[in-house]
Amino acid sequence: MPLPDKFFLFIQDDYHNVKLRVKINEKVLRGQPLIFSDDFNVPVHAPTSGLIENICFNSDSIKKNIKIVISPDYLDQWIRLNPIKDYKKYAPEKLIKIIHQSGVVGLGGGQFPSSKKIIFSINRAHTLIVNAVESEPYITSDNCLIYNHISEILIGCKIICWITKIKTVLIAIQEDNIQSISKIQHLIKNKSLFKICIIKKKYPAGSSKVLVKSLTGKEVPHGKHSIDIGYLIFNVATIFSIKRAIINGKPLTERVVTLMSDKNLLSGNFWVRIGTPIKYFLTSNKLKQSFIASVYLGGPFMGKKINNLNHSILKKTNSIFITHKKEKNESISEKTCIRCGYCSYVCPVNLLPQQLYWYIKNKNHVQTKKHYVLDCIECKACEKVCPSYIPLVKYFIQEKNILKNITLENNRKKMSLIRFKTREQRLFNEKRMIHENNDTFLMKKKDKKINNITKTVLKKTLQDAIERMKSKQ
């Protein structure tokens, strides 16, 4: 796909600790880091060579974000790359650092730093699960990647196993991807390390907790992650990016994105640069804005609607779903819950959506937490079967944010209390030291006075004795 006239790179800055490495009117090369990396932030890299046109703080497109605008020079020049031929000659710590500095994050939607995930799995995980199961219907980006780049993905798996000392790799793939399955079987040579696991096509089979249950029969406990029970899960796109970061020395600047519509007028996979405006992406594929009703980042179930087409492709954007304009408005208003219980039957993580809905309506945050609203994977299966058209996931997301804010506020109060107690203890210790020093000073002064009196008495006694001796003579 040709380069757009502008790239929009959004950098999340929830903690206000992002430090920029570039400034306006500065020339950059493709792969050049735009921010300094730390424990909380992986770097974002320039998707092409060009000029930093503008830097906007707290932009309107996404709240709490920094927006960097790059005008390409169409030369597409890379920075100096440092490929590694034999990764086994390097220490695991060095490889993890390269993955971190290459900006690799979870490309299945989580966007959690892959370097941290690998660090957490060392001495804890015994199995690597390669997630090639599409999270939603119609999305084919993972299948496209695994079909065309399976050899590179297998190398990426070996790199992760070298770092974490994992001895088993399970490649999870859907049963309808027959060509990809046969290609994997043909290329796998180490049968003791790699095992292919064919998953039935059932939504949402690609969710990490559902996938672990399907493959192993084990359930991830509430409030825990798959690593806690010994399974490290990576999306195929993430593993592919890890391979490119180590072997090719290339940071993450592009990804495969599925473009699809509700009427199946268009469906395809494209290599898209991070930061490409969605409006340009659609127009370059001959989609007229006048025929588009809405655009979703993601699939038809879990996709999030966007109103501003100047929004850009993010690292976690695996697909764009388009709905076309219809002659009639088919929007249906929310009705009262009839307690049918259908939502509970279809929930893949065994929650009680109906009960959570009533607790949320009554603002009973204690009960929503006890009933594991934080474990909701936001698959919207409950919404699809609800006869009252209640947007349950919308309520669950709002409740998650409320619980998150409550937790942050409680932690802030705890830290304030700890700081207050520490300060009080310090002041008490200082006062005690002052009193002890004063008492010591007074004791020394008193002892000195007593010594002076004693010396005077002894001197007088001695003089009296001398005078008595003289009088006797």
UniProtKB/Swiss-Prot annotation:
EC number(s) recorded for this UniProt protein: 7.-.-.-
Binding site for [4Fe-4S] cluster 1: 337, 340, 343, 386
Co-factor note (free text): Binds 2 [4Fe-4S] clusters per subunit.
Record's subcellular location: Cell inner membrane
Keyword vocabulary terms for this entry: 4Fe-4S, Cell inner membrane, Cell membrane, Electron transport, Iron, Iron-sulfur, Membrane, Metal-binding, Repeat, Translocase, Transport
Molecular function in Gene Ontology: 4 iron, 4 sulfur cluster binding; electron transfer activity; metal ion binding
GO cellular component, one term: plasma membrane
Main location, first listed in the record: membrane
Residues making up the signal peptide according to the UniProt record: none
Entry cofactors: [4Fe-4S] cluster
Cited InterPro entries: 4Fe4S_Fe-S-bd (IPR017896), 4Fe4S_Fe_S_CS (IPR017900), Ion_transpt_RnfC/RsxC (IPR010208), Nuo51_FMN-bd (IPR011538), Nuo51_FMN-bd_sf (IPR037225)
Family: Belongs to the 4Fe4S bacterial-type ferredoxin family. RnfC subfamily.
Subunit relationships: The complex is composed of six subunits: RnfA, RnfB, RnfC, RnfD, RnfE and RnfG.
This protein's name: Ion-translocating oxidoreductase complex subunit C
Species of provenance: Buchnera aphidicola subsp. Acyrthosiphon pisum (strain APS)
Gene name per UniProt: rnfC
